[in-house]
């Protein structure tokens, strides 16, 4: 409706000499002067505009389905449709009296007006008042309300129904949600199976499942009887442990050493914070002179030990007067070892390399490839 008003204002502010009113069209028909806006074009456009006006005011009420309202509709709803229809009729009638040569009406323009009027009618209707269901006692699910006898003042909620409900569902006519109808077969399958107490009664005359005669007359073998016998299990926790673990007489009469007694004593708890440090630290170096003397003392030999020879023996005169030869003196000299880079010449070339003659293949491989210059 806003676009139609703007278009009419632009036409009034900028008059076009070629625009003709309805009276001028009739006068032109009597005089026999036919223009571009003659009787066929003008009458067709006027009829189309009137037909569009009639459809605009009638079709939205027929096509739009009535929505079910949860509460009472506002009193202003019925008063809004009248002014809207009057405004639309005035706009279309005033536009029908004009004939524009530059811009002719089309089917898309009529459809746009129809959609806009339908949208205005949809926006004019008030929203559903959900607060009317606030104090209702019940649970709403998929178009049905389950009346709860215990809970009150429940908020309106939508959720999937439980398949374990066996109470009767009451149809809720206040909901505006379209849901599929549940068949009787689906309701029957959704209910849980009944607990038949007579099946498990001790005084029943017939068993739950009938046992065939061949099963009753069957004779079990010895192996089946052996496997069917339950195993005898001993409770190891009820046995006295003194009967299980027998201590030998030698262990009972054993005398522990001082080392064993010292290790058997529990360690005293740490008193300093440094002793609780889990990271081990190196011990300070302390030399024990007495311990060193003890280690330096040779071990005493047993009296029954007879050595091969006396630890003290005399040196022979021949050994004392011996003269070392030049070979022994040379072998007695330590080997002189050079440093890593001592006496090393990195530019030394062997004489064989100086005399060598290169073959044509070596010359070919030694020739560098041509390098193209970058432009």
UniProtKB/Swiss-Prot annotation:
> What does this chain do?
May be involved (but not essential) in spermatogenesis.
Could you tell me which PANTHER family the record lists for this protein?
Answer: TESTICULAR HAPLOID EXPRESSED GENE PROTEIN
Question: Where Phosphoserine occurs along the chain?
Answer: 287
Q: Which domain of life is it from?
A: Eukaryota
The protein's name in its UniProt record? Sperm microtubule associated protein 2
Listed under GO cellular component are: cytoplasm; nucleus
Q: What does the record's miscellaneous section state? A: 'Kisimo' is a Japanese word for goddess of easy delivery.
Give compartment(s): Nucleus
THEG repeats span: 110-129, 176-195, 214-233, 250-269, 282-301, 318-337, 352-371
Keywords from the UniProt entry: Developmental protein, Differentiation, Nucleus, Phosphoprotein, Repeat, Spermatogenesis
The record's account of tissue expression is: Testis specific (at protein level). Specifically expressed in spermatids; Sertoli cells maintain the level of expression in spermatids. If isolated spermatids are cultivated for 16 hours alone, the expression of THEG is down-regulated. May require signals from Sertoli cells to initiate changes in its gene expression through spermatogenesis.
Task: Set out the biological process GO terms recorded for this chain's protein.
Answer: cell differentiation; spermatogenesis
Residue ranges that the Swiss-Prot or TrEMBL entry lists as coiled coil: none
- Chain intervals with Acidic residues compositional bias: 59-75
Database matches in Pfam families: THEG
Fill in the subunit field for this protein.
Interacts with CCT5.
Stretches the record annotates as Disordered: 1-78
């Amino acid at each position: 409706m806003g676009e139609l008003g703007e278009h009419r204002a632009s036409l009034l502010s900028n008059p076009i000499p070629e625009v003709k009113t309805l009276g001028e069209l009739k006068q032109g028909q009597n005089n026999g002067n036919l223009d571009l806006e003659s009787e066929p074009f003008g009458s067709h456009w006027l009829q189309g505009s009137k037909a569009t006006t009639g459809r605009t005011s009638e079709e939205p009420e027929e096509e739009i389905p009535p929505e079910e309202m949860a509460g009472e509709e506002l009193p202003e709803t019925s008063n809004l449709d009248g002014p809207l229809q009057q405004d639309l009729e005035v706009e279309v009638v005033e536009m029908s009296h004009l004939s524009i040569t530059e811009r002719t009406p089309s089917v898309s323009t009529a459809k746009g007006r129809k959609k806009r009027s339908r949208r205005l009618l949809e926006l004019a209707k008030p929203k559903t008042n959900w607060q009317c269901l606030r104090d209702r006692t019940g649970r709403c699910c998929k178009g049905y309300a389950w009346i709860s006898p215990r809970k009150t003042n429940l908020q309106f909620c939508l959720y999937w129904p439980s398949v374990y409900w066996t109470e009767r569902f009451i149809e809720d006519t206040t909901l505006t949600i379209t849901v599929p109808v549940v068949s009787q077969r689906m309701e029957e399958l959704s209910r849980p199976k009944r607990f038949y107490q007579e099946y498990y009664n001790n005084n029943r005359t017939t068993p739950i499942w009938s046992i065939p005669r061949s099963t009753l007359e069957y004779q079990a073998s010895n192996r089946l009887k052996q496997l069917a016998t339950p195993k005898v299990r001993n409770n190891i926790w009820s046995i006295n442990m003194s009967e299980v673990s027998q201590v030998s007489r030698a262990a009972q009469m054993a005398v522990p050493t001082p080392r064993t007694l010292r290790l058997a004593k529990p360690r005293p708890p740490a008193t300093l914070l440094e002793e609780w440090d889990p990271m081990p630290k190196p011990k300070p170096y302390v030399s024990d002179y007495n311990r060193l003397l003890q280690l330096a003392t040779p071990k005493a030999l047993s009296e029954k030990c007879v050595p091969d020879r006396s630890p003290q023996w005399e040196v022979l005169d021949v050994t004392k007067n011996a003269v070392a030869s030049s070979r022994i003196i040379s072998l007695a000299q330590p080997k002189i070892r050079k440093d890593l880079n001592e006496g090393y010449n990195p530019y030394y070339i062997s004489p064989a390399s100086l005399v060598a003659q290169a073959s044509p293949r070596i010359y070919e491989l030694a020739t560098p490839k041509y390098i193209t210059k970058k432009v």
